[in-house]
Amino acid sequence: MDAAGGLLSLGAYGSGVLGAWERQARAISNEGQIRRTRETDGVFMFGDSIGVQDGPALARQLTQLGISIAVHNWAGRPVTPAVDALDLWAQQYGLPHRILMSVGSNDIFTPPAVEAQVDRTMRIVGEERIVYWVNVQAARTGHGPDIKVSDQRNSAWINLQLADAQRRYDNLRIVHWAEHLASSPNRLARLLRDGLHPSVPLGQNARNGLIIEAIKAG
């Protein structure tokens, strides 16, 4: 969520305004890997800066389980353009049985946008595929207390939309990262390096572990 670095104002929801993200770091699989993943019914992943950071380690773990992965991870990106990328891959390559959505942290600036994009994701994917969506935790330590409170409130708002969507879609699985962090007093400090991005290796291993557990559970 590096696009959050320059806050021009508190924005409409108190967390600031999302900056330009299009020139930020990205990790996108080549066409050969995308097609192999589709043909072997692996996992398509769409993420933000957390995906850019943690995606390679997740890919190694999935490979050890015999599961291929193709990624479209882009730092600073909110949900809407991530779903655009999902739609494009669906049209160009078709989709495997499992889709991992690791986005939402950059939507603390405009939380109401998430619900429609979750619905859009589920329409693109259809009823026969499973979507794994990692929920969010943000309270950026580099900002003042008012912004951190807004971050936390907006994260909860996003997560509520995901929970509501799960009740509407039988094939939507929520990966409960926020609950994992909240379940022990020291986890926020140990598993997040800046109130948002997982620490390496502890936070990265914990978050990727939750994703692996969800995928293995089906």
Question: What are the language-model segments listed below?
Answer:
Residues 1-45, 51, 92, 187, ...:
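N-terminal secretory targeting modules
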Residues 31-120, 140-146, 156:
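Conserved SGNH/GDSL esterase-like catalytic core that processes O-acyl groups on lipids
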Residues 74, 136, 177-179:
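Active-site loop/turn elements of alpha/beta-hydrolase fold enzymes
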Residues 91, 119-123, 160-167:
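Surface-exposed alpha-helical segments enriched in charged/polar residues
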Residues 102, 134-135:
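Alpha/beta-hydrolase-fold catalytic nucleophile elbow
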Residues 126-130:
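A short helix->loop->beta-strand "cap" motif at the edges of active sites that frequently abuts
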Residues 141-218:
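Catalytic His-Asp segment of secreted/periplasmic serine-dependent ester chemistry enzymes
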